[in-house]
Amino acid sequence: MLKINLFILMITVAMSSGAIAQSPQAQKILIYKGPGTCQGCPEAISSLLTKAGFNTQYIKPGQLTKKNFKKTAMYVQPGGSDDASEVINALSKNEIKNLKSYVFNGGKYLGICSGGYLAGRHIVDKETIKSFSLLPTTVDEEQEDPDSKIERIKWKNKKRSVYFQSGPAFNLKHLPNADIWAIYTKTGNGAALINKYGHGKVGVIGPHLEATEDWFDDSDLESPGLSHHLLMDFINTLLQDKSIFKRIILNG
């Protein structure tokens, strides 16, 4: 009897501390689909998350409201066009504030390629482009060549070949407390990482780990194999909560 009561007590404490994660079905994930996204990018990440059991919903400019962010487990900013400012120009200042407040108060942000640029201070021709400013660092191009290619990265100390097109490089010197998941093997720049923003977390990935086989075919690239398992491992870690956050109002 004592052992049973102790077990129940342990389960209760774990649930109250957020140690037991919600099932995927209970987690709503918002995926931006609007001006500034590339063809097939929102759909690729949505398909992957839906197959994993998550409740995915597309969201467009005019819909980044406080109401829509309620009970949201993660916001996804997928890959986009060569001009990341298209997204910024499509959103109102209040919508950007709502997004930042959501993350600051314990939400999760996943930025892939263009979404990674938008997470930090994006540099184009030595000019700083306005962004979400969720990362305290500048974000530059990993390489100037705009063509799709197979890029080599070191993911958790294992070399991988992944789909890449005009992806961002993250300045690790400005992110001393970040959880570094991947670097580009040629330059050593950050390719994937998770960093705190207020009480929330920001996960950014330069390469397109959500790419499907048709992406390789359309670009006349020989597929090295899909990277979906890497992306899902990253997302599952991003979604984990080790404590319950106290809500704080973000000003500005």
Q: Residue locations for each model-derived region?
A:
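Class I SAM-dependent methyltransferase SAM-binding "motif I" and its flanking Rossmann-like core
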Residues: 120-161
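Short, solvent-exposed loop/turn segments at secondary-structure junctions
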Residues: 36-37, 81-83, 116-118, 139, ...
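Extracellular ligand-binding/catalytic regions of CAZymes and related secreted enzymes
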Residues: 27, 100, 207-252
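Catalytic beta-strand/loop cores that center a nucleophilic Ser/Cys/Thr
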Residues: 144-215
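Short hydrophobic beta-strand segments
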Residues: 26-38
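Boundary at the C-terminal end of the N-terminal hydrophobic targeting segment
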Residues: 19-21, 26
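Bacterial N-terminal signal peptides
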Residues: 5-16
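Helical hinge/lid and interdomain linker segments adjacent to catalytic or ligand-binding clefts
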Residues: 38-123
